[in-house]
Design a protein with these regions (language model features):
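Short acidic/glycine- and proline-prone juxtamembrane loop motifs at membrane-interface regions
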Residues: 38-44, 225
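Membrane-lumen/periplasm interface segments of specific transmembrane helices
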Residues: 82-190, 204, 208
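Transmembrane-helix signature of polytopic, membrane-embedded enzymes
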Residues: 7-29, 200-202, 206
Length: 272
């Protein structure tokens, strides 16, 4: 419930009441919506991330730090928030340079708050590998633990950023899989470049694009992918999903119809 409220407030802050209502409905009734009712970390993570994004949009930078730190120790992926802060800093700085009142448009207190908050969130996002190394005495402890989840899908692999999706695709589908990944990535670029998506604002766009980049860089796509896509829910405010009432209703019906299938596949037959 908290994630839905904050998502509504976030989309309302960058869009309209129509977009906010429908984006929240699509999020709640998505195929993976049932995960919000079970004891998974997603519910807490989404509350923290949506709260941090809302604080970013409202320029309450110091509030982002505690939310980001707690989120970092809830689930991986908070580095996307740090990158979004960096993009926000650059955009505000560039805007201030074009103004004759730069000190008023972008005061130093805001610059300091953004930099400090970004560094704190980034440090928290990188903390688990350091903790794992300190506890086990092995510098590769965290990475080996993560790679152990890959064995059942692609066997033993060496990690290199931006390769997991291609490894998974080539293992199961060969060259066709590589082409499929390229098509998916091209589709993502097309979606983010649409005017209706960019209308959600730099902050939402920066975070969701950064989070998508994080998934492509380090995550092996398997049945957990739908669950890990939940933090990108602010994009549901795009015209692609809620541009018209008919379009929004269609997506809502699709989500509701797919929920039973997702529950069977990801809960009874597998794990989300």
């Amino acid at each position: 419930a908290g994630a839905c409220v904050l998502l509504y407030r976030l989309v309302l802050a960058v869009g309209s009441a129509h977009r906010a209502r429908w984006a929240t409905a699509l999020f709640a009734f998505a195929p993976t919506g049932f995960l919000l009712q079970v004891a998974y970390a997603e519910s807490l993570l989404l509350v923290l991330l949506f709260g941090a994004l809302l604080a970013l949009v409202r320029r309450r930078y110091w509030l982002i730090a505690p939310l980001g730190v707690v989120a970092a120790f809830t689930k991986p992926g908070v580095l996307a928030l740090a990158l979004a802060l960096a993009v926000h800093l650059v955009v505000r700085w560039a805007g201030a340079r074009r103004s004759v009142r730069a000190a008023e448009v972008f005061p130093w207190r805001d610059r300091i708050a953004i930099v400090v908050t970004g560094l704190v969130v980034a440090a928290a996002g990188l903390a688990w590998p350091v903790i794992a190394t300190a506890v086990t005495g092995r510098p590769d402890a965290y990475l080996d633990t993560e790679l152990s989840w890959w064995v059942g899908f692609v066997g033993r692999q060496h990690f290199a950023p931006l390769t997991p999706w291609f490894i998974m695709a080539s293992t199961w589908l060969g060259p066709l899989g590589i082409g499929l990944v390229v098509v998916v990535l091209a589709g993502a670029v097309w979606f983010f470049s649409r005017r209706s998506t960019r209308a959600l604002g730099t902050d939402v766009l920066a975070f969701t694009a950064s989070y998508g980049l994080y998934l492509v860089a380090v995550f092996l796509p398997q049945q957990s992918l739908p669950r890990l896509l939940l933090p990108m829910a602010p994009l549901l405010g795009s015209d692609v999903f809620v541009g018209t009432r008919r379009r929004a209703v269609t997506w809502l019906v699709v989500g509701v119809c797919l929920q039973p299938i997702a529950i069977v596949l990801l809960w009874f037959l597998g794990y989300p």
